[in-house]
Amino acid sequence: MTEAEKIEVRDITRIERIGAHSHIRGLGLDDVLEARAVSQGMVGQKDARRAAGVVVQMVREGKIAGRCILLAGEPSTGKTAIAVGMAQALGTETPFTSMSGSEIYSLEMSKTEALSQALRKSIGVRIKEETEIIEGEVVEIQIERPATGTGQKVGKVTLKTTEMETNYDLGNKIIECFMKEKIQAGDVITIDKASGKVNKLGRSFTRARDYDATGAQTRFVQCPEGELQKRKEVVHTVTLHEIDVINSRTHGFLALFSGDTGEIKQEVRDQINNKVLEWREEGKAEINPGVLFIDEVHMLDIECFSYLNRALESDMAPVVVMATNRGITRIRGTNYRSPHGIPIDLLDRMIIIRTVPYSEKEVKEILKIRCEEEDCVMHPDALTILTRIATDTSLRYAIQLITTANLVCRRRKATEVNTEDVKKVYSLFLDENRSSKILKEYQDDYMFSEITEKEEDFGIGGGSKRRLDIGAGDAEAMEH
């Protein structure tokens, strides 16, 4: 074999990130909003999924806005999974913004501004406009360049459809667009007359035999029918936040790319609201209320809850879905306790969807789906042991053991994860219960001891007791 024949071909590996909820494709409901047992990556939680399906249906119809839904349940019961399923079910047309309750705390902008931006990111505006386009197959292009090499270029293009053929004179700007898109004879193109934008749709089927080999990106399309000049309705979908950023004088549209939007004045927002409502009255635009999902909502403080009370009553408000795993706990920023750490007046505006713990059978099904998602072949006995670990500890811990067990399996050059692999990673990585047990056993060896309830009420820790042992003389000196 000669040197020229020794060619090594390597396939380019496509990197796909596998997230905690990347296996979810929707809510797993049928046409009458009944939950299937296992569908679209969702398992169990039939009542919660059915309730979420009703909310999705209402959002699709666009009839409701400013409603608030709370997903409440114990940890590892699929609250975030239901929210991800809602986002997948709504599709890309409906704005869906996801954020955590702790994301609003920043030194650059106020808490209410962060919430306001999140709310306006969740409201879409469909703007309709009619444009005049020229659509046809390129028969011939002639471009005349100046002899000196500098100056304006002029040219002609011949376009045809199945019914007609016409010549067009080209200006310098259109010629540059043609050269940028690499337009040649046989291409099917569209030219926007208003903006001068040239779009290449593909190659004509009549030119399919021009080349013996073509790249994968080459697309063959039919020659257009009818007139060359057509009127076409174009729909642009933008969010209110994007319109805010573009109209904010301090930053302008470049802030859309940098992400550094800063605080936007309320006057700008009011003007945009009035303009969008005016467009809606004229039939130029449609308002599409989306969904704002706030995870760990108990991390918001009393000022944020007060702001949400007013924001939810606005006409320009999306459907807000919140999730929390807290029971009766303290409202952040106050000394009062309430259910889920949310004030009673805001709870009164919510409808609450409860999630229940998964059964052992459902946990096994979830682990099986995660094994498929992570390309891990697991023996049935190993899956049974992993299910038992999940019921004794937590579902998240068991899911994390799948990847580590798969790595141990590959280390011994096997293709199937067995019980020994699962036992090995279980002994290597501690769960929360075993870790707490070790900490209680060896807590005196650690730097700080456990804080008792009495110490917590006084706001002191184990290492602060010595500071309270003030002598009588010191106390008198402090009084004077």
Swiss-Prot record:
Q: Which reaction equation describes what this protein catalyses? A: ATP + H2O = ADP + phosphate + H(+)
Q: Carries keyword ATP-binding?
A: yes
An example molecular function term from Gene Ontology annotations: ATP-dependent activity, acting on DNA
Transmembrane portions of the chain: none
User: Known InterPro entries for this protein?
Assistant: AAA+_ATPase, P-loop_NTPase, RuvB-like, RuvB-like_C, RuvBL1/2_DNA/RNA_bd_dom, TIP49_P-loop
Q: Where in the cell is it found?
A: Nucleus
Q: What is its EC number?
A: 3.6.4.12
Q: This protein's superkingdom?
A: Eukaryota
Q: Its quaternary structure? A: Forms homohexameric rings. May form a dodecamer with rept made of two stacked hexameric rings. Component of the chromatin remodeling Ino80 complex.
Q: Matching PANTHER family, A to Z? A: RUVB-RELATED REPTIN AND PONTIN (PTHR11093)
Supply the name of the protein: RuvB-like helicase 2
